[in-house]
Amino acid sequence: MALSKDEKAATLKEFGLHETDTGSPEAQVALLSARINQLTEHLKDHKHDHHSRRGLLLLVGRRKGLLKYLASTDIERYRSLIERLGLRR
């Protein structure tokens, strides 16, 4: 259920600050969002997969923390990111 190398590379290319950027909040949030979307689709078919549901909730919490950090340090980058990802806030 992990992202493939190609999916990860495409996400990092779109949201990273440079080609090999994996540490910026934008890149991390984009990767987490991709995994969250993938898990959400999985759970639509497998409603009783509670182990995956718990993993999903952990990922959502991690993304929330990164978004909170980004909002407190640079509000413009935060607003740009949530608009590009289509997140509600």
UniProtKB/Swiss-Prot annotation:
Matches recorded under Pfam families: Ribosomal_S15 (PF00312)
NCBIfam families assigned: S15_bact
Keyword Ribosomal protein: yes
Domain of life: Bacteria
The name this protein goes by in its record: Small ribosomal subunit protein uS15
Subunit structure: Part of the 30S ribosomal subunit. Forms a bridge to the 50S subunit in the 70S ribosome, contacting the 23S rRNA.
Listed HAMAP family: Ribosomal_uS15_B
Family named by the database record: Belongs to the universal ribosomal protein uS15 family.
InterPro entries reported for this sequence: Ribosomal_uS15, Ribosomal_uS15_bac-type, uS15_NS1_RNA-bd_sf
This protein's UniProt keywords: Ribonucleoprotein, Ribosomal protein, RNA-binding, rRNA-binding
Cellular component, GO annotation: cytosolic small ribosomal subunit
GO BP of this protein: translation
Function: One of the primary rRNA binding proteins, it binds directly to 16S rRNA where it helps nucleate assembly of the platform of the 30S subunit by binding and bridging several RNA helices of the 16S rRNA.
One Gene Ontology molecular-function label: structural constituent of ribosome
